[in-house]
A protein has these predicted regions:
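Secondary-structure transition motif
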Residues: 1-156
Length: 156
């Protein structure tokens, strides 16, 4: 399986006006930097907490989905939702979840498993889904850095 390795980060206001940069991720001391091909080989210093990886997937409009994006989605099926939620759309945040587990006697080294997941917040309940094929009409509606109010509205 091949996918485009791409990162994004929001520009550090100390160095630029807070634009989003997309490209290759570099570390320079304590600085996180993105080399955005749109601007040649210039490095752009970005805020560490805003760095997110491209999932390799796009939404129904062809928009690339990055870690930290807020997506509106509707599950194909009810589980784990009750029948009263059937057909309802949900907002969720895209996150990369990394799990570690111990090996066995044959392979004692520690193992890692990672997958993309949508953490759905509805009322006071939280759900998560890691099987993207179970979603349809997924649409990026913002991200948790520029649009935190979308998640706060869902939590209330």
């Amino acid at each position: 399986m091949n996918r485009e390795i791409l990162f994004r980060g929001k520009g550090n206001p100390k160095y630029n006006n807070g634009d989003w940069f997309y490209g290759y991720l570099l570390f320079d001391g304590d600085d996180y930097q993105i080399v955005d091909p749109r601007y040649g080989s210039c490095r752009r210093t970005v805020l560490k907490e805003t760095v997110g990886e491209f999932t390799g997937m796009t939404d129904k409009n062809g928009t690339k989905i990055f870690e930290g994006d807020i997506v509106r989605t509707q599950p194909f099926y009810d589980r784990p939702y009750s029948a009263t939620r059937k057909g309802k759309q949900f907002l969720g945040v895209v996150n990369l979840h990394i799990h570690t587990f111990k090996g066995n006697k044959i392979f004692p080294e520690q193992k890692y498993n990672s997958f993309w997941q949508v953490d759905i917040i509805e009322d006071t309940e939280k759900y998560n889904h890691y099987n993207w094929s179970r979603f349809w009409n997924c649409e990026v509606v913002g991200n948790k850095f520029d649009n935190p109010e979308l998640i706060k509205e869902e939590e209330q």
